[in-house]
């Protein structure tokens, strides 16, 4: 097998050159990081679960007409995706106070918000991804006003869908992070959802018990990260519920 050309390696994923022009292969690693990689461990099986959960979500979003970079899953750890020009912003949608919002504003974690909040963060690890305003975004040329409007409208639609999807399996969507990119098709450009949506990038709580089912289990040294991710996958119908737990990892539905 020929050695693939590596385009980019991030904290949790690697991008390789795809088989066709305008495509990449996105590989999900087992690395768990927090606080901009100041905390780092390898957790066996995490990449497999994130790949399948993100595939499940992106496939649903695509069927709803929400444009994404996702083409198809290749194997347990890899997806074929469209090559996009990533906008250097993390877009966070918050439905319930938690994490940095609770710390910044002195809110008790778990406080419901009267409306969903959309926040923008400049993607720069050396600066710890500072929060920025729409004025910062346009002033520094990261995106133009119409692109910001497109991102916000897509974020609202995605949040509405995901909130319902997770509520249907007894999970509350507290908040989640997204990235968007510019997809060029001939002379036309459109904004599409990129990166991933998984328990790595979303806060997910069990509706009844408030048990955390996301990367906060790693951030806060709670343990049980893989079990929590497996439970999310099981509720979404990705893991076969009839299969017993196995030490070699979860059994995934083809």
Swiss-Prot record:
Gene3D superfamilies linked: ATP-grasp fold, B domain, Phosphorylase Kinase, domain 1
GO CC terms: cytosol
UniProt EC number: 6.3.2.6
Superkingdom per UniProt: Bacteria
PROSITE patterns membership: SAICAR_SYNTHETASE_1
GO molecular function: ATP binding; phosphoribosylaminoimidazolesuccinocarboxamide synthase activity
Any GO BP: cobalamin biosynthetic process
Pfam families per UniProt: SAICAR_synt
Keyword check for Lipid biosynthesis: no
Keywords: ATP-binding, Ligase, Nucleotide-binding, Purine biosynthesis
Pathway where it operates: Purine metabolism; IMP biosynthesis via de novo pathway; 5-amino-1-(5-phospho-D-ribosyl)imidazole-4-carboxamide from 5-amino-1-(5-phospho-D-ribosyl)imidazole-4-carboxylate: step 1/2
Catalytic activity: 5-amino-1-(5-phospho-D-ribosyl)imidazole-4-carboxylate + L-aspartate + ATP = (2S)-2-[5-amino-1-(5-phospho-beta-D-ribosyl)imidazole-4-carboxamido]succinate + ADP + phosphate + 2 H(+)
Enzyme class label: ligase
Protein family according to the UniProt entry: Belongs to the SAICAR synthetase family.
UniProt-listed PANTHER family: MULTIFUNCTIONAL PROTEIN ADE2, SI:DKEY-6E2.2
Protein name: Phosphoribosylaminoimidazole-succinocarboxamide synthase
Naturally occurring in which organism (per UniProt): Bartonella henselae (strain ATCC 49882 / DSM 28221 / CCUG 30454 / Houston 1) (Rochalimaea henselae)
The encoding gene: purC
């Amino acid at each position: 097998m020929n050695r693939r050309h590596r385009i980019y390696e991030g904290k949790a994923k690697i991008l390789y050159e795809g088989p066709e022009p305008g495509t990449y292969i996105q590989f999900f690693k087992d690395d768990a990081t927090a606080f901009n990689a100041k905390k780092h461990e390898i957790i066996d099986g995490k990449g497999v679960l994130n790949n399948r959960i993100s595939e499940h979500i992106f496939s649903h979003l695509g069927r709803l007409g929400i444009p994404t970079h996702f083409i198809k899953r290749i194997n347990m750890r890899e997806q074929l995706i469209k090559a996009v020009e990533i906008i250097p912003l993390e877009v966070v949608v918050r439905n319930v106070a938690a994490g940095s919002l609770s710390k910044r504003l002195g809110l008790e974690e778990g406080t419901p918000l009267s409306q969903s909040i959309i926040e923008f963060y400049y993607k720069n690890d050396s600066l710890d991804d500072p929060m920025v305003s729409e004025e910062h975004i346009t002033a520094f040329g990261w995106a133009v006003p119409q692109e910001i409007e497109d991102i916000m409208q897509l974020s609202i639609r995605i949040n509405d869908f995901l909130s319902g999807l997770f509520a249907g399996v007894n999970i509350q969507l507290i908040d989640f992070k997204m990235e968007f990119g510019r997809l060029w098709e001939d002379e036309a450009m459109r904004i599409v959802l990129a990166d991933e949506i998984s328990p790595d990038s979303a806060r997910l709580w069990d509706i009844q018990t408030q048990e955390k089912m996301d990367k906060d289990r790693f951030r806060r040294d709670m343990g049980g990260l893989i079990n929590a991710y497996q439970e999310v996958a099981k509720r979404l119908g990705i893991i076969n519920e009839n299969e017993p737990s196995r030490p070699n990892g979860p059994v995934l539905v083809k």
